[in-house]
Amino acid sequence: MAAVTGIALGMIETRGLVPAIEAADAMTKAAEVRLVGRQFVGGGYVTVLVRGETGAVNAAVRAGADACERVGDGLVAAHIIARVHSEVENILPKAPEA
């Protein structure tokens, strides 16, 4: 049986840092999610990651994608994984300790 966690993962990939910051700000204001971090993918692409309950992550990613589009054509992709497999957890950045 595959091991899964109950916390959803939301991802937004952008062209450039400004849309990424705008998306992160909108996501954390729109819903009860935790900003896990950001990854500089290369070529100017930045991915922002949030965690939380599935409904909250869904609302946050929608808000982040909308905010990102308002600052130009920075949105590359937006995606949610409702229940992340434990093997995938190993490659994700760790959330900062509170």
Curated annotation (Swiss-Prot):
CDD domains: BMC_CsoS1
Biotech use: Expression of 10 genes for alpha-carboxysome (Cb) proteins (cbbL-cbbS-csoS2-csoS3-csoS4A-csoS4B-csoS1C-csoS1A-csoS1B-csoS1D) in E.coli generates compartments that resemble Cb, contain RuBisCO and have its catalytic activity, showing it is possible to make artificial, functional Cb using these 10 genes. Cargo proteins can be targeted to these organelles. Artificial Cb assembly in E.coli requires csoS2-csoS4A-csoS4B-csoS1C-csoS1A-csoS1B-csoS1D (but not the gene for carbonic anhydrase, csoS3).
Keyword Calcium: no
Family label: Belongs to the bacterial microcompartments protein family. CsoS1 subfamily.
Originating species: Halothiobacillus neapolitanus (strain ATCC 23641 / c2)
Listed GO CC annotations: carboxysome
Main location (coarse class): other
Swiss-Prot/TrEMBL keywords: Bacterial microcompartment, Carbon dioxide fixation, Carboxysome
Function, in words: One of shell proteins of the carboxysome, a polyhedral inclusion where RuBisCO (ribulose bisphosphate carboxylase, ccbL-ccbS) is sequestered. Assembles into hexamers which make sheets that form the facets of the polyhedral carboxysome. The shell probably limits the diffusion of CO(2) into and out of the carboxysome. There are estimated to be 2970 CsoS1A/CsoS1C proteins per carboxysome (the proteins differ by only 1 residue). Unlike beta-carboxysomes, alpha-carboxysomes (Cb) can form without cargo protein. CsoS2 is essential for Cb formation and is also capable of targeting foreign proteins to the Cb. The Cb shell assembles with the aid of CsoS2; CsoS1A, CsoS1B and CsoS1C form the majority of the shell while CsoS4A and CsoS4B form vertices. CsoS1D forms pseudohexamers that probably control metabolite flux into and out of the shell.
Family annotation (PROSITE patterns): BMC_1, BMC_2
Gene that encodes the chain: csoS1C
Superkingdom field: Bacteria
Entry text on domains: The tight homohexamer forms a pore with an opening of about 2 Angstroms in diameter which is positively charged.
Protein name: Carboxysome shell protein CsoS1C
